[in-house]
Amino acid sequence: MTSEQIPNRVLLFDGVCNLCNGAVQFIIKRDPDGLISFTSLQSETGQSLLKKSGLPTDRFDSFVFIEDGQVYTKSTAAIKVFRHLRGPWRLFVLFFAVPKPVRDMVYSFIAKNRYKWFGKKNECMLPSPSIKKRFLP
């Protein structure tokens, strides 16, 4: 996939993480205009985007949100995504008032325990036909 084919907003997520997959489903329901596209961190496109962004390709402990060429990780990525959702979810931008080290500490604690608390799949989720167009290969 060339850089011209990459949408303006892409969320990279851990494709085997149940919590992450649930978050993607949550986002899709609240982004009916399809402003955000998705790819797993483990996918060919995800790996390519991680490399281009100078991020490690073997650690899957953070959402990565790429918006208009800017790369965001951890709590900042999550808050940036919420900014595009319909309804009261946009109010999550208020968390930008919390210092980034504190936000990222909480994010990292959840990320570290996500498999223990929510489980994981053996392989990446396959999107249903109705949402497949939102997922990059």
Curated annotation (Swiss-Prot):
InterPro entries: DCC1-like, DCC_oxidoreductase. It holds the Pfam family DCC1-like. GO terms for molecular function: protein-disulfide reductase activity. Belongs to the DCC thiol-disulfide oxidoreductase family. This is Uncharacterized protein YuxK. It comes from Bacillus subtilis (strain 168).
